[in-house]
């Protein structure tokens, strides 16, 4: 009789399992592959990616935004999906650092894989990383600056943060122009971090330089035929209602009539209902009617005769924003005018942007609403420009709420790396190896930035490391000249909250993947045909 029983299968035949080192290696390989995919987009001289839809080859995206790249590609590896999730979370939380968080997590796992091969237990690595994280976070906090009490200096900080964010985007050639634009837009919010008050519209034609900030709300629709094209101090009613009351047409019914006279009576009755609804709307005392749905010729004519500006087919996002900035409410019934909140502004007028007519609402009551009008040669340029502007707006909104800033250009990473190295020097045992690996992963950020710019990264990073160990806490990478410079003088400033979020999220993702020692792929549940 055999002294050892054969393993008993407990999984369904369609399920699969990876255990121990194989599972861990699979996780490492997937995460590192994702890191290698996006790391070439990092930094002011990062490269772009072209994403082509599998279902529609004509649909393509040109971008270097980490979150956009990762969310648009199909990924099967579970560890890689975790990095995609943290990149998406980074984008939702602070708007920037989506590539950095993925790269840092991947570099931590690359170092972790090397330690595992040297027989360092994953729990030892995790313990060392936790100690390193606390030290790095403390070093980052000690390097912060806060100029919120000085409006001039704080605005300059915001401009530098915007320039830093835009320097790696398609807008880098006009980063000063766009930095001023987004800073003005965010400061108009007066401390409010709700970016719904800032509307972005894209109009093909012209160049990126021709983009501008309009101090009002622009709706990409046309005013009804025969209606007033300009109104001062208007009363605005915003609705989401069907102007057609023809229930036969709406519900697809059929009616049999004996004569054309009866058919004419039915049409007259429907027109009467429609005009009654128009009368109720006009009785609100308004002179501007904005509807999400269609306004037919008959109601449009009625509104024109009564001096009411009618705007139809306003998209839902547009009327939500318009209601927010004008102080109105979106209504669908008109029986109780006294309960309806009417919006207002100083001026409504039809203006031209390029070859298109749009409607501008100026003198918004809150004074916060504004519109960024983007111009560009192609739709691909405009889409990428919008993503870049969105990232910059999010970072600035975060900075207005959390006013502390840190230096960029690899300076913050080197400050944290130096502190972590000092911790490793006084830590006994294999845990010191894990702490050292954390410092190496942090140094990979400036290394990759230098590599992407075409410089000798080994030389530059060693010079940067030496400068910090000699006490120069403001030393950073000068990517314009390929040398070491003063990050503060270079104006490379980043939000403390963004940098801290990158550090914490990357560590959490790397630790989660490091803990994995088993990957189970369950079989799909079989659905049997039930007979009744």
Swiss-Prot record:
Which keywords fit this entry according to its UniProt record? ATP-binding, Chaperone, Cytoplasm, Nucleotide-binding
Q: Key word Magnesium present in the record? A: no
Localization, per the record, is: Cytoplasm
Q: Its Gene Ontology molecular function terms?
A: ATP binding; ATP hydrolysis activity; ATP-dependent protein folding chaperone; unfolded protein binding
Gene3D superfamilies documented for this protein: GroEL, GroEL-like equatorial domain, TCP-1-like chaperonin intermediate domain
What family, per the record?
A: Belongs to the TCP-1 chaperonin family.
Question: Mind telling me what this protein is named?
Answer: T-complex protein 1 subunit beta
Which gene name belongs to this protein? cct2
């Amino acid at each position: 009789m055999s002294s050892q029983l054969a393993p008993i299968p407990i999984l369904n035949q369609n399920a699969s399992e990876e255990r121990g080192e194989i599972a861990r290696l699979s996780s490492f390989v997937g995460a590192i592959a994702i890191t290698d995919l996006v790391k070439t987009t990092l930094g002011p001289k990062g490269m772009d990616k072209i994403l082509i839809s599998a279902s529609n080859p004509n649909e393509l995206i040109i971008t270097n935004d980490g979150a956009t790249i990762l969310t648009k590609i199909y990924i099967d590896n579970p560890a890689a999906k975790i990095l995609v999730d943290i990149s998406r979370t980074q984008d939702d939380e602070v708007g920037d650092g989506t590539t950095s968080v993925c790269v840092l997590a991947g570099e931590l796992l690359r170092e972790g894989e090397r330690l595992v091969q040297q027989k360092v237990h994953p729990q030892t690595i995790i313990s060392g990383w936790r100690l390193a994280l606390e030290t790095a976070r403390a070093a980052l906090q000690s390097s912060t600056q806060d100029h919120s009490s000085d409006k001039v200096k704080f605005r300059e900080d915001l401009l530098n943060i915007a320039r830093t964010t835009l320097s790696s985007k398609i807008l880098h050639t006009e980063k000063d122009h766009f930095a001023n634009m987004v800073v003005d837009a965010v400061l108009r919010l007066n401390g409010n971090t709700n970016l719904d008050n800032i509307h972005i519209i894209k109009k093909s034609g012209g160049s990126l330089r021709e983009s501008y900030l309009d101090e009002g709300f622009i709706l990409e629709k046309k005013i009804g035929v025969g209606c007033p094209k300009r109104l001062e101090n208007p009363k605005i009613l915003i609705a989401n209602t069907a102007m057609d009351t023809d229930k036969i047409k709406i519900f697809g019914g059929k009616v049999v009539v004996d004569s054309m006279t009866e058919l004419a009576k039915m049409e007259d009755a429907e027109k009467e209902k429609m005009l009654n609804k128009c009368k109720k709307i006009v009785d609100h005392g308004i002179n501007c009617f904005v509807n999400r749905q269609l306004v037919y010729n008959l109601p449009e004519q009625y509104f024109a005769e009564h001096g009411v500006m009618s705007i139809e087919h306003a998209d839902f996002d547009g009327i939500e924003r318009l209601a927010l900035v004008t102080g109105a409410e979106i209504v669908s019934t008109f029986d109780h005018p006294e309960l309806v909140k009417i919006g207002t502004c100083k001026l409504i007028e039809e203006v031209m942007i390029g070859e298109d007519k749009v409607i501008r609402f100026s003198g918004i009551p809150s004074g916060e609403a504004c519109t960024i009008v983007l111009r560009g040669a192609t739709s691909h340029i405009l889409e990428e420009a919008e993503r870049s502007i969105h990232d910059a707006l999010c970072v600035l909104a975060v900075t207005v709420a959390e006013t502390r800033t840190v230096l960029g250009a690899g300076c913050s990473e080197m400050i944290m790396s130096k502190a972590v190295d000092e911790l490793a020097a006084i830590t006994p045992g294999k845990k010191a190896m894990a702490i050292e690996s954390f410092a190496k992963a942090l140094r990979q950020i400036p290394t990759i930035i230098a590599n992407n710019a075409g410089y000798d990264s080994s030389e530059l990073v060693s010079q940067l490391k030496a400068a910090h160990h000699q006490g120069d806490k403001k030393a950073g990478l000068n990517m314009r000249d390929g040398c070491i410079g003063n990050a503060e003088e270079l104006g490379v400033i980043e939000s403390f909250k963004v940098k801290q979020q990158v550090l914490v999220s990357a560590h959490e993702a790397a630790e989660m993947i490091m803990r994995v020692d088993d990957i189970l792929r369950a079989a799909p549940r079989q659905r049997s045909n039930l007979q009744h």
